[in-house]
Amino acid sequence: MVATCLQVVGFVTSFVGWIGIIVTTSTNDWVVTCSYTIPTCRKMDELGSKGLWADCVMATGLHHCKPLVDILILPGYAQACRALMIAASVLGLPGILLLLTVLPCIRMGHEPGVAKYRRAQLAGVLLILLALCAIVATIWFPVCAHREITIVSFGYSLYAGWIGAVMCLVGGCVIVCCSGDAQSFGENRFYYSSGSSSPTHAKSAHV
């Protein structure tokens, strides 16, 4: 029962974290830039934000972004962070799908518990790799960007990335280390049997 709960917790945590990674990858509010104080920059229309895909200027009621499409002049750290975040987003899809198939409520024929166990371990490893890619990118980008521009604060995209990466890391570690062994995956399967008096639910143990 404990292993089953940990599997569900690992799946939910990882799924929410993966959504956060996708939000971070697709948005541009990574760092807020300003050469003066924020109120002064707002008055002078010089408050901006920088992300993987665009540089934006935020004025009162306006939000103008300039896409970063010229790869030749794009800094190396920005290209590397793009690659890391795209890899993290892509790795999350097979990881979540594999994790979905090993949940106790999902049954794929009469497969042995060891098959579910191996898929769970693979899903956990993918989620951990996803988290490491996101952590490196979300730390590397603001550090390198600070050398080029004046950063006054972090944007919501960066916070979403940090939270998502930590959740995926925790979820992956729970799946790999704490969700039981191959035997527990075989035992956590339920079938429906109707008796002569009333319907009952029974657990089937597979060796």
From Swiss-Prot:
Residues 23-82, 144-157 are extracellular. It is found in: Cell junction, Tight junction; Cell membrane. Keywords: Cell junction, Cell membrane, Membrane, Phosphoprotein, Tight junction, Transmembrane, Transmembrane helix. It is a multi-pass membrane protein. Pfam families: PMP22_Claudin (PF00822). Disulfide bonds: none annotated. The keyword Membrane applies. Its main location: other. Residues 1, 104-122, 179-207 are cytoplasmic. The chain crosses the membrane at residues 2-22, 83-103, 123-143, 158-178. The modification Phosphoserine is found at S193, S194, S197, S198. One of its GO terms (molecular function) is identical protein binding. The keyword Phosphoprotein applies. One of its GO terms (biological process) is bicellular tight junction assembly. Interacts with tetraspanin-3/TSPAN3. Interacts with OCLN. Plays a major role in tight junction-specific obliteration of the intercellular space, through calcium-independent cell-adhesion activity. This is Claudin-11. The gene is Cldn11.
